[in-house]
């Protein structure tokens, strides 16, 4: 709903849980009029992200800072979470922080592994891979953090909706999906 047009004009974007910065760099290359800040709580990942931005030539409109999803600074037109919400110990706390960091007409774009709301519907080849990875990576990562909600990599849209609305958002829609991911758009 107008996000691409805003990015083309130039807006402020926070890419939370950016890891090594691949998503931030791609967006900065695609939308050079916008300003991007990649946030991650892992300092070595932020160092790699800074180097990636330098190599890609997007240092003018991109920066990377160490910050957690519940405490990054600033206000933004767009906040993105690429495959990281389910790894967070307190995803509702992160959603609450996103809500407070968005400008009044801002958008939160959440990309998460595609999953149905019921276990049986996820017992397919892709779902099984996600459940396996979730068992050894996603769920332990979440449990090791404050709150430890442990959504795992297959929470489904209904559980994600509870997290998002628990953070104060009133509007949520599925904007796109593939066999591997779903893209959700949340607005205050």
Residue ranges with predicted function:
Residues 12-14, 24-70:
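Class I SAM-dependent methyltransferase SAM/SAH-binding core
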Residues 17-21:
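Class I SAM-dependent methyltransferase "Motif I" SAM/SAH-binding loop
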Residues 92-104:
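A short glycine-rich, Lys/Arg-flanked "PGG" loop and its adjoining helix->strand segment in the class I
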Residues 168-188:
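Core SAM-dependent methyltransferase catalytic element
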Residues 1-12, 26:
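Conserved alpha-helix/loop element of class I SAM-dependent methyltransferases that forms part
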